[in-house]
Amino acid sequence: MTERNIYSVSAEIAGRTLTLEAGRFAEQADGAVVARYGDTMLLATVVCAKEAREGTDFFPLTVDYEEKMYAVGKIPGNFFKREGRPTTTAILISRLTDRPLRPLFPKGFYNEVQVIITTFSIDMENDPGPLAIIAASAALCISDIPFAGPVGAVQMGHLNGQLVVNPKMNEIADSRLDLVVAGTKDAVLMVEAGAYELTEDEMLQAVIDGHAVCKQICDLQEQLVQLCGKPKRPFTPPVVDTSLEEAISAWMGDRLRKAVRSPIKQEREAQTEALKAEVIAHFTADEPEEEIANRTKEVTKAFEKLLKDEVRNAILDEGIRVDGRALDEIRPISIEVGVIPRVHGSAVFTRGQTQVLTITTLGSPGDEQKVDDLGIETSKRYIHHYNFPPFSTGEVRRIGTPRRRDIGHGALAERSLYAVLPDEKDFPYTIRLVSEVLSSNGSSSMASVCGSSLSLMDAGVPIKAPVAGVAMGLITGEDGRWRVLTDIQGLEDALGDMDFKVAGTAKGVTGLQMDIKTTGITYEIMREAFAQARAGRLFILDKMNEVISAPRPELSIYAPRIMTIQIPVDKIGALIGPGGKTIRNICETTGAQIDIEDDGRVFITTPDGAAARQAISMIEGLTREAKVGDIFLGKVVSIKPFGAFVNILPGKDGMVHVSELDEKRVENVEDVVSLGDEINVMVIDIDRTTGKISLSRRAVLTGETPEERKAAGAAPRPRPREEQRGGRDEPRSLRDELRGPRREGDRPRPRRRDD
């Protein structure tokens, strides 16, 4: 057996040990690293194809984060008892890992690269997201794959007014910030964050502090490379035929400039495609038939390079964008609310040629989404789904399950609004938002944020403040010049160097996502992007407030009504009943949906108030505890010479002594009440030892309160002894008279076996 060489490096990060190890596992992968932080342990493997895929003109990188149930000591609960399709969390971590790695591969490198991250152990304290980025970067660095890493990643929180590095998972719930930053030693590559209205300065400081820790993690990866790194495989970037570009540029003259400066996307694309077809036809006309295909690719690539240069140079040199806007100008905005009948809330937000319809649906607490990530069962009362159909960009594409992009954009919009949602105790509804992108020319995710805020207010959801979002772009030049663009459209996104999305209220930032296509950006660029984004966000909020500035005072007539009551925890079983029989009966009788929390809160969801009141009455009847001074409409269930027994609650009787039946003296109980009568009675005493209840009809008739009775010296009559009830209903003296005198020598007869 060949002895393995195992290499390991460690460093203290935020009081916990980060360890990177290579050589123990997956020796046939091009690179494999186990990253451990606390007891969270991940294996990252990377494999690169030996040759570029034929006909590929893009970099085919795939990142898969594989959740394994054994990592938390669980067996999958499905029929096959094995892991299935990736969860939303797995997809989001895959995207989180992909984004900072992709810019660091060389341009023109078209070999397929696959990164697989497998969860070995999850300790429920240390978030595996940043660790996945670190593990993947380390595996790429020690491999022979061309990669300009390493990349460090860290999570930042904001607790007790202080920034915290790598807060534990249970601390995130109390943190005003959940931010992941990734970068090289020289620059920031990626930021993803949700926040509770932090200022731009606070957000930037979190990025700066996080990047400082990223540098330490990069140093650790470099130590591992020195121990076991492989020489990088040779790669020569494709040679650019500048002479062909010059020839095409000269032949087109200013036609390309005129084509790309059309403000309408469809017209711009049509003119650009027509010009490209002319260029291809002209520059392939003299080629032999067998060379036409290759020549067409070369001409197409040269044309697209000229198109990119035209757009970028116009911005850098002239400050002119393709649609004629200034660098900090936002496209025309139009807003409508309440556009869809019968739904609980709706809004259409249109910015330029990007249009998003967002629908709000309110449901009961039982409609919460059950989430089971690696055995951690939680529920979500707020859900946001983002749909990007092919017609939104004028394309034909198969419609199937949501793509990773759709899930990622929905998650960004979801976390951008989370900070302004009402507390569950004030608004117990489950909230589902669906953003339908009807037309897209860039920044559809931020349009979803705006549409969602408007739709929530239209639905009457008491959000704390309106939220708007805007996407910023960046154009850089080889001479160090750069320009930040506000509200980028599709072409600027595709040909630019950065996508910097910021969402928030007038007070502060609630959501942030930054992706770049270069090898990093500086703090100065980020500071400028934050400043322009704030100005743009406030402008959009003003436009939104012109249409609807606060939540509607009432919910839609089509929305369900939820009422909340509190019952004693020890009464939950009584409400549910054997096998759920009792609660099912209430639901069937009233048409209500009833959800019970472990702390005794009961949510009654009904289509109207009458059904809710009926359900509450039935629940209170089952769970209410009698108290001194309470008045009940009770039913007489038993009559005795000394008084009447009255049922006041299900399974709960009290006794009205003959002296408490009326204001005047009562000689015979049946002169006042009969079996089955319903009478109003007041609880005047509850025996602390036995729990037996004494009732008074007289107190109700006279209007006396327990305090007045006590002050007047009235005391509850002593209850009869136990043997006077049950099987021996008659008083002892009456029983003795009926039985007659006992004869001497009488003894109880022993029971026979067949009695």
Swiss-Prot record:
Mg(2+) binds at D493, D499. InterPro entries: ExoRNase_PH_dom1, ExoRNase_PH_dom2, ExoRNase_PH_dom2_sf, KH_dom, KH_dom_type_1, KH_dom_type_1_sf, NA-bd_OB-fold, PNPase. Its cofactor is Mg(2+). It is found in: Cytoplasm. GO terms for molecular function: 3'-5'-RNA exonuclease activity; magnesium ion binding; polyribonucleotide nucleotidyltransferase activity; RNA binding. Its main location: cytoplasm. Gene3D superfamilies: GHMP Kinase, N-terminal domain (3.30.230.70), K Homology domain, type 1 (3.30.1370.10), Nucleic acid-binding proteins (2.40.50.140). It comes from the Bacteria. Residues 719-755 have a biased composition (Basic and acidic residues). Its EC number is 2.7.7.8. One of its GO terms (biological process) is RNA processing. GO terms for cellular component: cytosol. Keywords: Cytoplasm, Magnesium, Metal-binding, Nucleotidyltransferase, RNA-binding, Transferase. Pfam families: KH_1 (PF00013), PNPase (PF03726), RNase_PH (PF01138), RNase_PH_C (PF03725), S1 (PF00575). It catalyses: RNA(n+1) + phosphate = RNA(n) + a ribonucleoside 5'-diphosphate. Residues 699-755 are annotated as: Disordered. Residues 629-698 form the S1 motif domain. Residues 560-619 form the KH domain. Involved in mRNA degradation. Catalyzes the phosphorolysis of single-stranded polyribonucleotides processively in the 3'- to 5'-direction. Belongs to the polyribonucleotide nucleotidyltransferase family. This is Polyribonucleotide nucleotidyltransferase.
